[in-house]
């Protein structure tokens, strides 16, 4: 069991039960999955770019990414239907907790002039989205080996019914929200 999962079981569940007055332990919101998505627009011209993005994402998450493809053809973006335009990874259970722990305690503090993540990026359904501008904040990525600085989107999907519950869940888990 990972460090974050133990913290969730021993500290977060009792704290949330007290704060929101849950009667049953199953009502307490929990992390369901984390989706890490990397949109690689340049992949339409050069397939090598997508391969290096996949390699980066695999190193960061420890899981093989799936290639995302264009749903429709868009002439303005010069893409056709089913062209590869990015990659994503869905993390659940142990891998999810390991990644969340690494993100909150190691990667985010390495961001330049980091003052905390926005507390407004909730979607109204208890999910939290976070954008990262460069992949080099993760310790697995070697600075000399990257071909291009790429960003990524990280979505925390929770079982929380409201944004307030999700915010408290992530705050107790150690997400550094800006004040």
Curated annotation (Swiss-Prot):
Disulfide bonds: none annotated. One of its GO terms (biological process) is translation. Transmembrane segments: none annotated. Coiled coil: none annotated. One of its GO terms (cellular component) is ribonucleoprotein complex. GO terms for molecular function: rRNA binding; structural constituent of ribosome; tRNA binding. InterPro entries: Ribosomal_uL5 (IPR002132), Ribosomal_uL5_bac-type (IPR020930), Ribosomal_uL5_C (IPR031309), Ribosomal_uL5_CS (IPR020929), Ribosomal_uL5_dom_sf (IPR022803), Ribosomal_uL5_N (IPR031310). Keywords: Ribonucleoprotein, Ribosomal protein, RNA-binding, rRNA-binding, tRNA-binding. It comes from the Bacteria. This is one of the proteins that bind and probably mediate the attachment of the 5S RNA into the large ribosomal subunit, where it forms part of the central protuberance. In the 70S ribosome it contacts protein S13 of the 30S subunit (bridge B1b), connecting the 2 subunits; this bridge is implicated in subunit movement. Contacts the P site tRNA; the 5S rRNA and some of its associated proteins might help stabilize positioning of ribosome-bound tRNAs. Part of the 50S ribosomal subunit; part of the 5S rRNA/L5/L18/L25 subcomplex. Contacts the 5S rRNA and the P site tRNA. Forms a bridge to the 30S subunit in the 70S ribosome. Belongs to the universal ribosomal protein uL5 family. HAMAP family: Ribosomal_uL5_B (MF_01333_B). PANTHER family: 60S RIBOSOMAL PROTEIN L11-RELATED. This is Large ribosomal subunit protein uL5.
């Amino acid at each position: 069991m990972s460090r974050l999962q133990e913290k969730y079981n021993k500290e977060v569940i009792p704290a949330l039960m007290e704060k929101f007055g849950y009667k049953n332990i199953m009502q307490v919101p929990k992390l369901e999955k984390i989706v890490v998505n990397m949109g690689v627009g340049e992949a339409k011209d050069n397939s090598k770019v997508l391969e290096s993005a996949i390699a980066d994402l695999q190193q960061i998450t420890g899981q093989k990414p799936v290639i995302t493809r264009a749903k429709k053809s868009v002439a303005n973006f010069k893409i056709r239907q089913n062209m590869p335009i990015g990659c994503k990874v869905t993390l659940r259970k142990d891998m999810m907790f390991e990644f969340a722990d690494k993100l909150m305690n190691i990667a985010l503090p390495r961001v330049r002039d980091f003052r905390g993540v926005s507390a407004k990026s909730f979607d109204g359904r208890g999910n939290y989205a976070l954008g990262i501008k460069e992949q080099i904040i993760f310790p697995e990525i070697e600075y000399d080996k990257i071909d291009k600085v790429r960003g990524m989107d990280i979505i925390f999907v929770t079982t929380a019914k409201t944004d307030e519950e999700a915010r408290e869940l992530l705050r107790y888990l150690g997400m550094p929200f800006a004040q």
